[in-house]
């Protein structure tokens, strides 16, 4: 119907007054309108739940995302951080260092402390150092080095730690492979990552029968490295070098490799050690799949602090009662439990 202006109600003078409720209807609401051929974003939020700086940051990212969409960029190519937000200062004590440097420092301080334990046994920091040196030398002799990727297929065993530490000592990045993946997916990941080297336990050799690159059997490392000493100079990684490549689930298409540099990994290690106060007395459990980036939270920090890394056996990971008992029996002090 029509709207009629009036200035009296019941014979008394009346005047319209706008009233502001000064209250957000929801914790956060975003409205988009067009004004003079421009998109206008308005954010309404509850001040008792969010800081103004947080909302400004959200608005900035919305602007970047909207601009990328209007330029018809692919979603994965849109950077949601301004350049000044993409770097984080390292602890001055660790400036210019990488995980490899911090691990070697831990070996010097705690050579005989247990470093990694799985369902079948454990190895000390000295043993992990020697075994990973062996892996690194074999990779180096194959021409492996910085900015190169190596696949790891060994299930949830302590050999996984031997492998990824060895790969990083040789300067490269590791690509975790899950033995439960279809062979076609493993083949795609190895080809897409350009991995010319593969570290595998004999149990899973059939899964990679197609592979024509360099293969190192992790089953032989423990015995072969007993009296081993390095005879080549390793190319240690620099902070700007690639640390790992973990592939997405591929639920919306082909899996995509997500890459992280050593300096980013070091920032995460420092954050975990600071917030969890990781010490040599800790037993840190690794629960997440190695092919899920949540695994990185627990794989690295303990091995820079002299703590023990415990790898949950695959056969109990999906049994909540067994997991709870394992936590108690192993005296776990820290762990990350993402959804399965």
Summary of predicted features, one role per range:
Residues 1-28:
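A short, small/polar-residue-rich loop/turn motif at beta-strand boundaries
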Residues 25, 36-77, 91-266, 274-277, ...:
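Carrier-protein-dependent adenylate-forming modules in NRPS/ANL systems
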Residues 154-155, 246-249, 282, 288, ...:
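Active-site beta-alpha turn of Rossmann-fold NAD(P)-dependent dehydrogenases/reductases
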Residues 179, 247, 288-289, 313-314, ...:
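Conserved donor-binding loops in enzymes that form glycosidic bonds
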Residues 188, 196-197, 283, 332-334:
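Short, Asp-centered acidic motifs that coordinate Mg2+ and/or phosphate
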